C-alpha cells in the first residue's frame, strides 16, 4: 500500500504528482510495491486526484487529518485474502524493490510486524500482518501512522537492515527534491 494523500505544503504541490527523473512519485511508489512482489497494489489518494495504471485507488476524504486516516482507509480497503500489507510512503523514492522483498521474506519466515531499518534506525516501509490491522487502525492518529502500535508491541517487531539497498530520505522540500534527483542521476 502506498500512502500518497498529502498536499505537500513545504514542497508546494501534492507529492504524488511531483516528477523525478521524468516519472511521478506516485508511479515510482506503485512500481516499488509491484516490483517488490506485493499484490494488489493499493494507492491511497487525497489532496490531488491521481490515476495510476494497474492499482487499486482508495480515496481518503479525511486526508487533511494526516497519515493515520490514510493508513486506516488503505488497510480497510484491502481484500480479505491479504495476509499482510507493506506500507510505503510516496515521498521516499530512494527505497528500492529489494527493501520490500526483504520485508516480505521476513514475513514468510514468521515475522508479523516488520520494519525496514537503515543503520539500525527504524523507518519505512513497514509490513503489518493482518491480525494487527485493527490495532494499527485504532492507534493511528494524525501523522503517526503505525508508529504508536509498533512502539506498544516491541517484542513483535522485527527490524530488517536495508541501508545497503535503499535510503529512507524524504522529499519534503524543493531542496530535498533537488538532492534526491542528483543522487538518482548518479
Where are these regions (language model features)?
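A residue-level structural signature of the nucleotidyltransferase/glycosyltransferase Rossmann-like core
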Residues: 92, 124-127, 138, 168-169
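Short, well-ordered alpha-helical scaffold segment located
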Residues: 94, 99, 132-135, 176
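Nucleotide phosphate-binding site architecture
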Residues: 8, 18, 133-134, 178
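Conserved nucleotide-sugar donor-binding
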Residues: 82, 123-135, 174
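A short acidic, helix-capping loop that chelates divalent metal ions and anchors anionic groups
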Residues: 9-13, 136, 167-168
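Conserved alpha/beta core of the MobA/IspD/sugar-nucleotide pyrophosphorylase nucleotidyltransferase superfamily
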Residues: 138-186
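Nucleotide and nucleotide-moiety/phosphate-recognizing core
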Residues: 1-122, 155-162
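Short beta-strand and adjoining strand-loop segment in the mid-core
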Residues: 72-74, 133-136
Amino acid at each position: 500500500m502506498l500512502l500518497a494523500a498529502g498536499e505537500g505544503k513545504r514542497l508546494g504541490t501534492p507529492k504524488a504528482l511531483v516528477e523525478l527523473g521524468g516519472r511521478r512519485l506516485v508511479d515510482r511508489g506503485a512500481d516499488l510495491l509491484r516490483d517488490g512482489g506485493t499484490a494488489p497494489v493499493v494507492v491511497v489518494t487525497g489532496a490531488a486526484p491521481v490515476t495510476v495504471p494497474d492499482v487499486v485507488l482508495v480515496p481518503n476524504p479525511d486526508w487533511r487529518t494526516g497519515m493515520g486516516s490514510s493508513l486506516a482507509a488503505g488497510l480497510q480497503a484491502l481484500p480479505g485474502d491479504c495476509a499482510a500489507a507493506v506500507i510505503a510512503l510516496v515521498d521516499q523514492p530512494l527505497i528500492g524493490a529489494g527493501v520490500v522483498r526483504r520485508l516480505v521474506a521476513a514475513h514468510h519466515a514468521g515475522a508479523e510486524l516488520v520494519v525496514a531499518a537503515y543503520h539500525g534506525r527504524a523507518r519505512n516501509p513497514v509490513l503489518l500482518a493482518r491480525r494487527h490491522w485493527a490495532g494499527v487502525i485504532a492507534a493511528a492518529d494524525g501523522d503517526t501512522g503505525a508508529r504508536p502500535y509498533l512502539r506498544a508491541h516491541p517484542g513483535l517487531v522485527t527490524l530488517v537492515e536495508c541501508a545497503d539497498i535503499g535510503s529512507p530520505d524524504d522529499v519534503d522540500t524543493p531542496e530535498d527534491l533537488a538532492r534526491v534527483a542528483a543522487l538518482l542521476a548518479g
